[in-house]
């Protein structure tokens, strides 16, 4: 099992949730307002007067065979609007109940 943390511009919310739905990734936790900036490109997302946009985040746990498909779907969303920003990070999950 893998944990995937997805940070994205709020404009991507519907597309990200749709990608999860299409792969039957039902369970996730959603963080509506998440501040940050990309490590390489893109504008900061601080929700301030100067940097008005905001990020959101989703963390989900998926079976190993879903990871590559989900990452591909997320990459496609990002590439269609690169300046908005979207990144996904995968962690090994040792145990859960």
What are these regions (language model features)?
Residues 1-97:
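Positively charged, small/polar-rich N-terminal and surface patches that mediate targeting and assembly
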């Amino acid at each position: 099992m893998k944990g995937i943390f997805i940070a994205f511009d709020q404009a991507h919310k519907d597309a990200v949730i749709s990608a999860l739905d299409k792969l039957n990734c039902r369970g996730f936790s959603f963080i509506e307002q998440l501040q940050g900036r990309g490590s390489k490109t893109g504008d900061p997302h601080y929700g301030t007067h100067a940097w008005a946009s905001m990020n959101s985040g989703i963390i989900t746990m998926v079976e190993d065979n879903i990871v590559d498909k989900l990452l591909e779907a997320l990459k496609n969303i990002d590439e269609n609007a690169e300046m908005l920003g979207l990144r996904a990070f995968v962690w090994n999950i040792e145990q859960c109940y």
